[in-house]
C-alpha cells in the first residue's frame, strides 16, 4: 500500500477547520472529543482556545494529528481583550464557554466547525462541512429536539468570513456585557438573541443531545426516547450536568464516551494508515538554545524573534510572576517560560543554554552578566 508522505505546505492544504475551547481542568474531555473527531475524520486543522493548557500536551498530540494530515493550533486567550468574567447561571458550565466569541481572532479559514468538549463524534463529518450556509452566519441544531428554546450552541458551523467582516466578535461582547445577568443559558442565550433570524437549522444527527435524557424524562418528553439510535447520530452531545464521565449518570450511551476516552492515539493513526492516509509529522528539534532573564514585561522584539526563528529554542526566566505579554509566548513550541524562578535554577538554565540574549530595555539583573562570563555565553 502506498502512503502519503508529504511535508511542509502540502500538509496544510484542504484541511477542515475545527475549534474546541476549554481549560486544563477539562483536558480529558477535550482530548476525548478530539480523539473521536480524528478517529472518523482526517485532514482536520484543530484549534484549541485556552488559557492554561501546557505546551507539552500540544506538542505530543500535534504529532498524531499531523500524521493523519491535520494540524493542532494552541490559541492562548491571554490578555485584557479576552476577559470573560460574565455571569453564567448554569453551574456545570464555566467561563471558557464564552471563548467561542473569539474564533475570528485566531481561525484563518472561511468556514469553521465549533464543537463543545462534552461530545463525541461517531462518523464522517464531510456532509456537515458541505452544508451551504447561504446568507446565514451559522448553522446549528434545535435545542433539545425542539423542547428547548432556539438552537443549541454546542455544535456551530460558522461562516467565519462573515463573522470577521461584520465584527461579530465585538457585537457578541457588547451584547453579553448588556444582557449576561438577564439570560438563563449564558453565551447560548446571547448567540440565540443575535442570530435568531440568521441561522440555518441542522439535522439533529449533527448535534444529538443525548444528555437531555434526564431532562426529557423529568418533563415527560417521551418522544425523545422514540428517536432511533441506529445508526448512531453523527455527534453525541452530553449536555446537562448528567455527564457520562461522572461516577453515576442516568443518560443513554455513556459507553460511547468511555470508548473514545480510552482509545489510544496510536490506534487512530494506524487505522488511517491502513486506509492509505499517513503523513510524516513535523518533529520539532531545536538547533540552538538561548536564554534570557527578565525583570520586566518588555523583552525587545521577542515575538518577532520567536516567529522568525522556529528552530531556535528560547528559554525566558523571571524571578516574579510574568505579565500577559510574556505568558502569551507559551503558545509557541520553541518557547519555554520559567516564572518565579530562583537564582540557582537560573544559573543551571544558563549553563545548559548555548547563548544568552540580552534583550531587556530596563531593570536589568546585573548578576546574570557574571554568570555569562563564568560560563562563556
Tell me what each language-model feature is.
Residues 48, 282-328:
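Conserved catalytic-core segment of nucleotide-activated headgroup transferases in glycan assembly
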Residues 121-148:
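Conserved donor-nucleotide/metal-binding helix-loop-beta segment in metal-dependent transferases, i.e.
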Residues 351-364:
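Acidic donor-binding loop of glycosyltransferase active sites
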Residues 2-16, 20-25, 32, 41, ...:
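A glycosyltransferase accessory/donor-loop signature
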Residues 324-340:
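Nucleotide-activated donor-binding/catalytic signature segment of Leloir-type glycosyltransferases, i.e.
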Residues 63-105:
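Active-site-proximal specificity loops/subdomain of glycosyltransferases
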Residues 112:
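Short aromatic/hydrophobic "clamp" motif used to bind/position activated sugar donors
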Residues 319-320, 336-349:
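Conserved active-site histidine-acidic residue motif and adjacent donor-binding/catalytic loop
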Amino acid at each position: 500500500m502506498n502512503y502519503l508522505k508529504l511535508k511542509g505546505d502540502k500538509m496544510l492544504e484542504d484541511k477542515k477547520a475545527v475549534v474546541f475551547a476549554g481549560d486544563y481542568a477539562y483536558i480529558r474531555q477535550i482530548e476525548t472529543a478530539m480523539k473521536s473527531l480524528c478517529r472518523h475524520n482526517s485532514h482536520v486543522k484543530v484549534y484549541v482556545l485556552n488559557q492554561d493548557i501546557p505546551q507539552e500536551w500540544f506538542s505530543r498530540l500535534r504529532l498524531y494529528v499531523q500524521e493523519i494530515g491535520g494540524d493542532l493550533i494552541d490559541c492562548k486567550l491571554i490578555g485584557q481583550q479576552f476577559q470573560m468574567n460574565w455571569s453564567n447561571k448554569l453551574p456545570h458550565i464555566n467561563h471558557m464557554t464564552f471563548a467561542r466569541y473569539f474564533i475570528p481572532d485566531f481561525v484563518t479559514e472561511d468556514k469553521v466547525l465549533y464543537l463543545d468538549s462534552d461530545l463525541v463524534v461517531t462518523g464522517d463529518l464531510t456532509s456537515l462541512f458541505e452544508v451551504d450556509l447561504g446568507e446565514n452566519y451559522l448553522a446549528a441544531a434545535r435545542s433539545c429536539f425542539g423542547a428547548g428554546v432556539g438552537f443549541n450552541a454546542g455544535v456551530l458551523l460558522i461562516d467565519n468570513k462573515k463573522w470577521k467582516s461584520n465584527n461579530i466578535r465585538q457585537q457578541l461582547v457588547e451584547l453579553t456585557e448588556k444582557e449576561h445577568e438577564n439570560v438563563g443559558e449564558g453565551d447560548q442565550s446571547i448567540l440565540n438573541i443575535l442570530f435568531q433570524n440568521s441561522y440555518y437549522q441542522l439535522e439533529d444527527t449533527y448535534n444529538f443531545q443525548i444528555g437531555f435524557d434526564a431532562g426529557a424524562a423529568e418533563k415527560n418528553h417521551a418522544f425523545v426516547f422514540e428517536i432511533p439510535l441506529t445508526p448512531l447520530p453523527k455527534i453525541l452531545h452530553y449536555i446537562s450536568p448528567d455527564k457520562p464521565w461522572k461516577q453515576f449518570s442516568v443518560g443513554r450511551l455513556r459507553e460511547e464516551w468511555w470508548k473514545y476516552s480510552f482509545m489510544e492515539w496510536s490506534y487512530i493513526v494506524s487505522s488511517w494508515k491502513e486506509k492509505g492516509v499517513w503523513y510524516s509529522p513535523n518533529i520539532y528539534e531545536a538547533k540552538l538554545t538561548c536564554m534570557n532573564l527578565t525583570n520586566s514585561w518588555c523583552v525587545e522584539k521577542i515575538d518577532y524573534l520567536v516567529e522568525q526563528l522556529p528552530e531556535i529554542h528560547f528559554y525566558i526566566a523571571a524571578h516574579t510572576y510574568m505579565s500577559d505579554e510574556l505568558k502569551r509566548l507559551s503558545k509557541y513550541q520553541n518557547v519555554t517560560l520559567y516564572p518565579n524562578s530562583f537564582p540557582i535554577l537560573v544559573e543551571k538554565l544558563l549553563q545548559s543554554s548555548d547563548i544568552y540574549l540580552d534583550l531587556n530595555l530596563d531593570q536589568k539583573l546585573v548578576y546574570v552578566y557574571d554568570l555569562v562570563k563564568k560560563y562563556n555565553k
